[in-house]
Amino acid sequence: MSDIHYISTETLNLESIQEIIVNQMKLELSEEAKVNIQKCRDYLDKKMESNSEPIYGINTGFGSLCNVKISNENLSKLQENLVKSHACGTGEEVPAEIVKLMLLLKIQSLSYGHSGIQLQTVNRLVDFYNNDILPKIYTQGSLGASGDLAPLAHLSLPLLGEGEVLFKGKKVASAEVLKHFNWEPIVLQSKEGLALLNGTQFMGAYGVHILIKAYKYSYLADLIGTISLEAFDGRIEPFNELIHFIRPHKGQIITAQRINEFLEGSEIIEQEKKHVQDPYSFRCMPQVHGASKDAIDYVRKVFKTEINSVTDNPNIFIESDQIISGGNFHGQPLALALDFMAIALAELGSISERRTYQLISGLRNLPAFLVDNPGLNSGFMIPQYTAASIASQNKQLATPSSVDSIVSSNGQEDHVSMGANGATKALRIMDNLERILAIELMNASQAIAYREPLKSSDFIEMFLSSYREIVPLVKEDRILHYDIEKTISFLNSFQIENDLLTMA
């Protein structure tokens, strides 16, 4: 396998991005990309030499200042001013892995030859990626229309030798890093600042990062839910394929199939049951988990289109000799999708917490709170409180961002997507889902021990054996905070196959 990923018109998807990340591949512009970028830049330079008409963002001001004409001698300064003036983010810093994704997605978008960027500017972004020079970017500041202006301004500052970067684990001034590599700051030419700042790469990077985790934790929700089902002495009939073939939602069918595969050979599931039905949180896993799968799959399709698109403005079309000002920077497709994914992930957490509640309730020959000597020991009473608190927070965070819009730029930008807020909220929900599922695994693994000497399937027994090496059985009260943190780390280290990135 090559250790280089060539930026080209070849479609990026979750699988290829995961491969780039896991294998720590370097980036390089393909010859096709280099030609496309250079042709577009040459066209724009010639156009500006012979054209005196105002062209938005190239020889005019920005936003509501679009009617202010800028002289040719100030075109470079205009772009530099744009980057500096728009670098006004605040709040928490964007995680390093998402910043690196932003670099990848910005390079991809600029490579198609519709942006007018200099080849050396894109190459410098490639250098940043390959050398893990990660600009310091903040989570707050983007309206998700005119693109992710503030975050992308911070992404672009180091090109000018401005701002700060994370390099070799330390925050350092960008100018120092340029000096370290003997690089000169980039002198931006006409339109370049706009090409860099207009775009949806903040929302895009968050979405890709969350999606990769969502597919993994959708799988883990099925697995942990299946362990809970067995621990609760649940019935297998609700997962019979006949039920799901007459309501053939893809996610529902996949979930039922997966649960049956997890349970293959289990003694616990095959033992005679005294109860007729199980609560919905067990019985309806295919319908609930499956609906979240279908939502995640829809979101994947939206982001696949977006990360292979040109999202700056104006766009340059050499073949038809046109420079067209449009609105590809508007993040509405992503904003709606991120809100949808947030709801889907919150629901996986909501139903997980309900299974945890059932397990500690002293039902079906399980001890109250899953511990010997209940009363003297409180056992797993309070982890359920924690899960309930987090599930409630997720419900609050799942309130859509995309229904809001605030007028900006003197009314010129009178409708915005707020997709960036949706992106950061969705990541918080994703992180919360990890914690809720970790708490369910703690409870399920404890409860299933009370079904011994009956065994589960070989797969589940192997999974639980690996888990027990990290988190021992609870025999008497201990500080469970540490168990929660160890369980989260265990789930984070759990690897899934790449083909699951298209099957939540």
Could you tell me what each predicted segment is?
Residues 56-70, 74-78, 85-110, 138-160, ...:
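FAD-binding core of FAD-dependent oxidoreductases
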Residues 2-52, 79-138, 229, 244:
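Glycine-rich, flexible loop motifs
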Residues 137-142, 319-323:
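Cysteine-centered functional microenvironments
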Residues 104, 112-134, 143-152, 157, ...:
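Well-ordered mid-protein domain cores that form the structural environment of catalytic cofactors
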Residues 2-25, 29-36, 40-43, 48-51, ...:
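C-terminal auxiliary extensions adjacent to catalytic cores
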Residues 74-77, 121, 214-216:
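Short, low-complexity, polar/charged sequence segments that are solvent-exposed and flexible
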